[in-house]
From Swiss-Prot:
Catalyzes the condensation of carbamoyl phosphate and aspartate to form carbamoyl aspartate and inorganic phosphate, the committed step in the de novo pyrimidine nucleotide biosynthesis pathway. Its EC number is 2.1.3.2. GO terms for molecular function: amino acid binding; aspartate carbamoyltransferase activity. It catalyses: carbamoyl phosphate + L-aspartate = N-carbamoyl-L-aspartate + phosphate + H(+). L-aspartate binds at K86, R169, R222. InterPro entries: Asp/Orn_carbamoyltranf_P-bd (IPR006132), Asp/Orn_carbamoylTrfase (IPR006130), Asp/Orn_carbamoylTrfase_sf (IPR036901), Asp_carbamoyltransf (IPR002082), Asp_carbamoyltransf_Asp/Orn-bd (IPR006131). The keyword Manganese does not apply. It comes from the Bacteria. This is Aspartate carbamoyltransferase catalytic subunit. Pathway: Pyrimidine metabolism; UMP biosynthesis via de novo pathway; (S)-dihydroorotate from bicarbonate: step 2/3. Carbamoyl phosphate binds at R58, T59, R108, H136, Q139, G264, P265. The keyword Transmembrane does not apply.
Amino acid sequence: MPYTKKDLISMKDLSKDDIFDILRLALKFKELNKSPVKKADSLRGKTVINAFFENSTRTRTSFEIAAKRLGADAINFSSSVSSTKKGESLIDTIKNMEAMKTDIFVVRHASSGTAKFIADNASASVVNAGDGLNEHPTQCLLDLLTIYENKGRLENLNVAIIGDIFRSRVARSNVWAMKTLGINVKLFGPPMMTRDCEAFGVPLCSNIDEAVENSDVIIMLRIQLERQDGEPEFPSVREYSKFFGLTAKRMELAKKDVIIMHPGPINRGVEINSDVADDPKFTKILNQVENGVAVRMAVLDTLIKNRS
């Protein structure tokens, strides 16, 4: 049965069949994106507002391109110049934009749960483009598409997620979805950045070599310094790179056809060395970015059909 909900808030809301339906549709849109015209019309006459209350490069641009390629009017809302600076509440802001006949809100916010809060109070559809430490479902879907394209399957793969797991909404979405799909996930990072990981119900490795060993896919995560409070959680960048960074030498422990992924932005020489990040044999980071447009086209197309 196809995904029929009004919104996309969490990967927990998607069944295995839902995920594959979206990925199959994304593959069709990826073919469209290779054509000279790159245009469809399923969102013609519809309005998509990118309501981003946090900074973003890849996600916001990707959603804007996706909406426009489907024929929608895509509007970028910036909280820095909005009436929220004058004391207007979040819901009043959303209600005012909804009164302009908005069909879909794409929401990014620093507070976990904000996307669901908006979805519960709006008749327009809502896509969670990242809410605090909670989830980032479309990043997860583009990661899954990238893995599927490079491995030819999703089930029974070994995936290592390494870095600041505690603050990573990408890690949360990926773990929930990968468990649903039968992917073997293991986690690793500094102790303060892997606290509460037992809630995921997947193995937590004791060192990076254990995490990398026999992996089909390695997903590296940056240190989210902007979300840290108080004392630093590691002695220095040099120490972090030594014990938690991905190097060419460590790559030798993984499977020969391993692929490396990263949600971006990359901090070179910290969680990943440049020679690894730039190696076309292993690295699929730009492939992820490319797939982001197709996946977000698939999500927007699915939600607008659900509204019909």
